[in-house]
Amino acid sequence: MLIQNTIFYKKEWRWSNFIKLLISQLAKYHCLEHEIPSAFSYKESTYGSSKSQNNVSLFTWGATHRERINFARAVCINSPSYSVLNFLIIPSTRFNIPFLGVDFVSLPKNHLLVLDFQPSLKVENQFNSELLDQLVKLKKSCHKSLPIAEKMSEEVSRFFSPGLIWSRLPKHKNSDYLIENQLYHSFKEYLVLYLNTLFTSEEVDQGLQQEIINGQNNYLNYRRNKDPARPMLSSLFGKDFTESLINKVLFSTNKVYN
């Protein structure tokens, strides 16, 4: 099944313009779509009480690039109560580049919005001053419109950069406007900057590459063990499917290989 033939490419899904932009930008760099195992590529389920059941659908989309991207994947969820776009680029460890992490989650009462160049090493060892300045400038511009959410714990914050966009919005029309305009604009800026940085970077030596491999594995292992989406996914799709999805697709260290 092609994602273009699903609800996730239609305006009824909140994040459709975002996923379209992701796929089109990756195509510009000649990334190839990666076939996701059928057990995880598309799934439908129901949730809620027997008297008030809702339908929910999930689509997992993937891509690779033979030189620059080990694995890029998007998890899309659509239901009356939950709407999710979770996206991660795992860059090749031959380049000293952070992850691109996107987590846009609409819950029954709130929107949780996370966008960042997520470091796999200490920030000072992965970001030069020019990139960091660009990122912080884009972040500040975004947060002129979007409120900054509560401070993250130290355990979690180590996996984010000073350029983190992190916001919590209530569900109302003004939030819809902010998502469709300011958030989309910032998302495009981050995506374009990230891909340009990734595809113009130079290869590292073997010593630094091993540090990057270790750093990527550290992040992926943390997310496998403590993914905050686990309770929501389990309630929508069941524990067995959720554990397999998290361990085999979303945060598998098997994708960290070059």
From Swiss-Prot:
InterPro entries associated with the record: Ferredoxin-dep_bilin_Rdtase, Phycoerythrobilin_Fdx_Rdtase
A GO BP entry: phytochromobilin biosynthetic process
Catalytic activity: (3Z)-phycoerythrobilin + oxidized 2[4Fe-4S]-[ferredoxin] = 15,16-dihydrobiliverdin + reduced 2[4Fe-4S]-[ferredoxin] + 2 H(+)
A single MF term (Gene Ontology): cobalt ion binding
Known EC number: 1.3.7.3
Keywords: Oxidoreductase
Job description of the protein: Catalyzes the two-electron reduction of the C2 and C3(1) diene system of 15,16-dihydrobiliverdin.
UniProt-listed PANTHER family: PHYTOCHROMOBILIN:FERREDOXIN OXIDOREDUCTASE, CHLOROPLASTIC (PTHR34557:SF1)
Protein family: Belongs to the HY2 family.
Name recorded for this polypeptide: Phycoerythrobilin:ferredoxin oxidoreductase
Organism ancestry: Bacteria, Bacillati, Cyanobacteriota, Cyanophyceae, Synechococcales
Gene label: pebB
